[in-house]
Amino acid sequence: MRIAFAGTPEFARVALRQLLDAGFDVPLVLTQPDRPAGRGLKLQASAVKALAVERGLAVTQPRSLRLDGKYPDDASAAREALEAAQLDAMVVAAYGLILPAWVLKLPARGCLNIHASLLPRWRGAAPIHRAIEAGDTETGITIMQMDEGLDTGDMLLSERESIRSDDSTATLHDRLSALGGRLIVEALEAAACGGLVRRPQPAEGVTYAHKIDKAEAAIDWSRPAEEIERRVRAFDPFPGASFQQAGETVKLWRAAVAPQRGAPGTVLSAAEGVLRVACGDLSLDLLQLQRPGGRRVGARDFLAVRSTLQVGATL
């Protein structure tokens, strides 16, 4: 079976690796253009491109696939490459570009998407973040036959994954990426022998995982402690929950709910390795923090540097 692969970040790289290790023929890889990254803002290839180059695969990086869009030459070149590949199917995983109708119709078996939720819950761009933020206790992977809607296509395979009480987006991402890679291999192997059954998504239970905005990172101490703690885990590693202290933006990577109460944003404890801040109902112990340009440290090390942070201060 000849498969094109469209994906960009680490989540997609894991799936591509599993497809290649399973012996699938991948004549073409689509991924986002190289982007400036790091302190030097040097152009950096995506995780998918790095693997594709390592494995000697052909790569194309269109800025758009819309033939009538801003970059028609990119789209036309991609179309030529896809048509020449004589595809049986196309696998899409966190690609980052909208696929127009001509792409969806081109492969003989259409386009299959690896989506990191149990559809129809958490359609959209940030299903892992939003599941943790909402306090969901389980999520999963859905392999979907793509159509022109936003994650509305028929479901082909799905499998559940528990969300642990200490999961961050980073830890849950790693388990789901491995699960997604395994399920897409199973789906394609079943498709090759006619064993896949398409199931329409239920009309009930639809929710949308809107893209994460950096502005969401700012902690609102007036919110309930449990809600803030979930957001801390949901925004690890991006964009990182944060608060202002002494004119600096401090990122908070781990926290735990504590029973003490006080005015929201007030420091209730700042000694003996305990940094506790009042929230809208209870309070939070800030367990792992990061100053600008620094590394993640525990509360004790953070307080050793922040000697001016005293009980009664307001964040």
Curated annotation (Swiss-Prot):
The keyword Membrane does not apply. InterPro entries: Fmt, Formyl_trans_C, Formyl_trans_C_sf, Formyl_transf_N, Formyl_transf_N_sf, Formyl_transferase-like_C_sf, GART_AS, Met-tRNA-FMT_C. One of its GO terms (cellular component) is cytosol. (6S)-5,6,7,8-tetrahydrofolate binds at residues 117-120. The keyword Transcription does not apply. Keywords: Protein biosynthesis, Transferase. Its EC number is 2.1.2.9. Pfam families: Formyl_trans_C (PF02911), Formyl_trans_N (PF00551). One of its GO terms (molecular function) is methionyl-tRNA formyltransferase activity. It catalyses: L-methionyl-tRNA(fMet) + (6R)-10-formyltetrahydrofolate = N-formyl-L-methionyl-tRNA(fMet) + (6S)-5,6,7,8-tetrahydrofolate + H(+). SUPFAM superfamilies: FMT C-terminal domain-like, Formyltransferase. Attaches a formyl group to the free amino group of methionyl-tRNA(fMet). The formyl group appears to play a dual role in the initiator identity of N-formylmethionyl-tRNA by promoting its recognition by IF2 and preventing the misappropriation of this tRNA by the elongation apparatus. Belongs to the Fmt family. This is Methionyl-tRNA formyltransferase. It comes from Methylibium petroleiphilum (strain ATCC BAA-1232 / LMG 22953 / PM1).
